[in-house]
């Protein structure tokens, strides 16, 4: 198990958010301010040390060795937000329709985290039934469809299940489909709505190789900011950090915390090819 301590003074930007139909936030009106939210350090203690208002779950899994490197609160559920897009994409692939126009749509949905494309595919393919199908296909243990069928971002998911999703992609998907999805996990610097999604894994492995899916939303009732993906030249490790953080820290503060956590999670990993 790993422990996480959050303690430092950083300058952040409070961002007023609007909610889309799927539960993923769109940034508006940045307002400069300062608050005590922190860059994070992660230690190898047996307990998690976090302020009460911050929830965090992490997991690092070595696909080559078939074991966890570290994990903390990996069975705690969080709102998946844009991580649901991974299920939309894998469900589309399983149906044999990851071709033609759908290739471009999935690329936009994953790399630029385009909510409008996700809305369209979610509605067209049965909404919550997508989650149900992928839970069965991947053997997910704690992923639950949203209560409101129109809000795909309200799907709940654990860090352990995120690991299982990436395991499925890397070990069970046909090679052609896997390569398509990996090429789409590019996490462009800015999302389709203009949000800066260069945080977490993409900051933690700036000179290495990563394939990442980020997620964020506000304000129901707090900031949900997640970073997930594969790191290492041969996609050896799955790295997951899920968080729920106070509104006062703003988006910049929340991403700074997640980036600090991600940097420590990958610090001891061998990211070179065998």
Question: Where do the model's predicted regions map?
Answer:
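Buried hydrophobic packing segments
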Residues: 88-92, 121, 162-169
């Amino acid at each position: 198990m790993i422990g996480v301590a959050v303690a430092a003074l950083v300058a952040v930007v409070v961002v007023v958010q609007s909610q889309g139909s799927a539960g993923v936030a769109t940034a508006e009106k940045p307002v400069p301010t300062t608050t005590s939210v922190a860059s994070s350090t992660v230690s190898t203690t047996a307990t998690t040390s976090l302020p009460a208002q911050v929830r965090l779950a992490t997991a690092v899994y070595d696909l080559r060795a078939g074991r966890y490197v570290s994990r903390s609160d990996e069975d705690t559920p969080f709102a998946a937000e844009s991580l649901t897009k991974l299920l939309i994409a894998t469900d589309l692939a399983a149906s044999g329709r990851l071709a033609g126009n759908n290739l471009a749509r999935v690329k936009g949905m994953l790399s630029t985290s385009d909510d409008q494309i996700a809305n369209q595919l979610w509605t067209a393919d049965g909404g919550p039934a997508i989650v149900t199908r992928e839970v069965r296909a991947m053997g997910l243990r704690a992923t639950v469809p949203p209560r409101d069928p129109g809000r795909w971002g309200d799907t709940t998911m654990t860090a352990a299940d995120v690991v299982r999703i990436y395991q499925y992609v890397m070990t069970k998907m046909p090679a052609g489909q896997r390569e398509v999805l990996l090429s789409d996990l590019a996490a462009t610097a800015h999302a389709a709505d203009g949000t800066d999604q260069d945080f977490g894994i993409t900051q933690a492995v700036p000179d290495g190789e990563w394939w990442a899916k980020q997620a964020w939303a506000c304000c129901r009732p707090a900031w949900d900011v997640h970073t997930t993906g594969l790191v290492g030249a041969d996609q050896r490790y799955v790295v997951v950090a899920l968080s729920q953080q106070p509104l006062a820290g703003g988006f910049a503060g929340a991403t700074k915390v997640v980036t600090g956590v991600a940097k420590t999670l990958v610090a001891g990993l061998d990211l070179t090819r065998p």
